[in-house]
Amino acid sequence: MSSRKEWALIVSLLLGAILVPINSTMIAVALSSISHTYNESIASITWVVTVYLIVMAVTQPIAGKLGDMYGNKTMYLWGVGLFLIASLGCALSPSLLLLIVFRALQAVGGALLTPNSIAIIRHVVSEKRLPKVFGFFGLGAGLGAALGPFIGSILIDSFSWHSIFWVNIPFLAIALFTALTMFPQYKENKSDAPLDIIGSLLLAGSIVSIILLTKNEAPWGYTVYSVLILLFVPLFFRREKRTQHPIIDFALFKSSTFTNANLSVLLSNLMMYAVLLIMPLFMTNQFGLNTSNSGMALSVFSIFMSASNWVGAQLHHKWGAKKIIFLSFAMMAGANLLFLLLSSSHSVLFLMLSLILGGLASGVGLTSMQVSSLATVDPGMSGVASGIFSTFRYFGSIISSALIGLISGYHTLFMILFAVSIIGVFVSLGIKSDETARIEKNSA
């Protein structure tokens, strides 16, 4: 494939994929305006956020499987098209109920395009160039998530909250046009296996129950959701072990590299989201910073995270996945020690150094985690593997938000995050080099 076509492919995929994290974080600054428009309580409005997160978590592993069945390019196109239509629906919604429905459809579109864009890259980009391309994606996605609230606030101040959905449409239209006209032709090994409907429903029930448990505020909720988890999760595992065509092939986890790469991204995302969620409150309470200044300080974390993602991608072939992921968690341990010291310090310089180290740690290993998760998987299973990786990544953020809700006191939280980073150091030791991982794949 020529360099021109390859870059057309990458830009098209990135245009679609970058809008998913932007729309995930941009909505946060719009909740008050949406509440005023529909004259609804903030508790009701938060379902605009919650439904997006739930549907994304439920749909991603299924979307990866659909890509392997019907073609990753086909599912990517459906994802971009659905995201475009849903964005239009969100912008024009006359009621909160319809806005929530279109946000759910937006999440389905995002879930379809995210794992399938990764699978397409696996098919058409040479193995040697994969880390650099994934690094480019990580840089874009990281900046998208970091800049989402900033972009959203500018749009809302200049126009209205509807504009955060209108802005998606031209970019999605370009991505769709580019994908239809400039995508290179390549052979996809489509799976003839049928979709496991029962397994999909049990997986959905399991994930929804877990998410609702972490977000529960009702006194009866803990009992009800715990019972549902104890019902759905064992039934899902039993179904997947017995069916001939599982929605998640647990044989993939026989590879220690695949397992540890997915555990690594879960632990990494857990700590990253903990910083993003807790540090604004910490900086306000501990340092007396206002919302604007704490947001600017936190942007330092996001910028260094995105930059180190790119650096980690460049170093992947030179150092290998294990060393880079080990370095990532070791730096996270150092950052969490600094956060612990901040509990008794009021030095802004010390705060900035902590955020810089935390950002570097959160970004440098992401590309190696992604590449390692695919290294032991046949190309025909790339969609499923990418869906699993995305789901593990998402569950890290779910666990993080649950921890913050359950734990009182910054010192205790930073101690737990330090312990998580040490666990990550040991998990990284189970990741093999790319060459060893390929041998592991062939012998599986």
Curated annotation (Swiss-Prot):
Keyword match Methyltransferase: no
Bilayer topology: Multi-pass membrane protein
Location relative to the cell: Cell membrane
InterPro entries documented for this protein: MFS (IPR011701), MFS_dom (IPR020846), MFS_trans_sf (IPR036259)
Major localization class: membrane
A GO molecular-function descriptor: transmembrane transporter activity
Any one Gene Ontology BP term: transmembrane transport
Membrane spanning stretches: 9-29, 42-62, 82-102, 104-126, 136-156, 164-184, 193-213, 217-237, 263-283, 295-315, 324-344, 347-367, 387-407, 411-431
Keywords on record: Cell membrane, Membrane, Transmembrane, Transmembrane helix, Transport
Similarity-based family: Belongs to the major facilitator superfamily. TCR/Tet family.
Protein name: Uncharacterized MFS-type transporter YvkA
Species of provenance: Bacillus subtilis (strain 168)
Gene: yvkA
